[in-house]
Amino acid sequence: MQIFVKTLTGKTITLEVESSDTIDNVKAKIQDKEGIPPDQQRLIFAGKQLEDGRTLADYNIQKESTLHLVLRLRGGTMIKVKTLTGKEIEIDIEPTDTIDRIKERVEEKEGIPPVQQRLIYAGKQLADDKTAKDYNIEGGSVLHLVLALRGGFGLL
């Protein structure tokens, strides 16, 4: 099937894809056509950033759908959030993002509602209304995710 990818310059690229293709595959096809490395590509559909390991079918992207390509500038900051199971989630943030926004990004990737998340960095629990910059969170920083169970006391 054909899909379209629209760049910020307004250029539209046509790609031949299968619904079983992963977002990684799509980024590789964009690289073949446009020479943009996949790690600099962010694909958006229906207002959501598409995750590399997922397929077009996962996002209900059908023939003649239009994806939007945004370039990740070097200034975008990649951090990791480590869960209690040891799983590491990579998240692309801006220094001005609030902790609440980072929790929303965790929810997008893992399905955990922000109200159940406690993020810890440098031994401190992070307040929702503060920014990454307030806590000196920068590229490569690792935050720890602890789940807050309803009704119980969260003892760390």
Swiss-Prot record:
Q: Which residues form the Ubiquitin-like domain?
A: 1-76, 77-152
Q: Name one GO molecular function term.
A: mRNA binding
Q: Which domain of life is it from?
A: Eukaryota
What the entry lists under Pfam families is as follows: ubiquitin (PF00240)
Can you quote a single GO CC term? nucleus
Protein role: Ubiquitin exists either covalently attached to another protein, or free (unanchored). When covalently bound, it is conjugated to target proteins via an isopeptide bond either as a monomer (monoubiquitin), a polymer linked via different Lys residues of the ubiquitin (polyubiquitin chains) or a linear polymer linked via the initiator Met of the ubiquitin (linear polyubiquitin chains).
Miscellaneous section: Ubiquitin is encoded by 16 different genes. Ubiquitin is generally synthesized as a polyubiquitin precursor with tandem head to tail repeats. Often, there is one to three additional amino acids after the last repeat, removed in the mature protein. Alternatively, ubiquitin extension protein is synthesized as a single copy of ubiquitin fused to a ribosomal protein (either L40 or S27A) or to a ubiquitin-related protein (either RUB1 or RUB2). Following translation, extension protein is cleaved from ubiquitin.
Q: What is this protein called?
A: Ubiquitin-NEDD8-like protein RUB1
Q: Which organism does this record belong to?
A: Arabidopsis thaliana
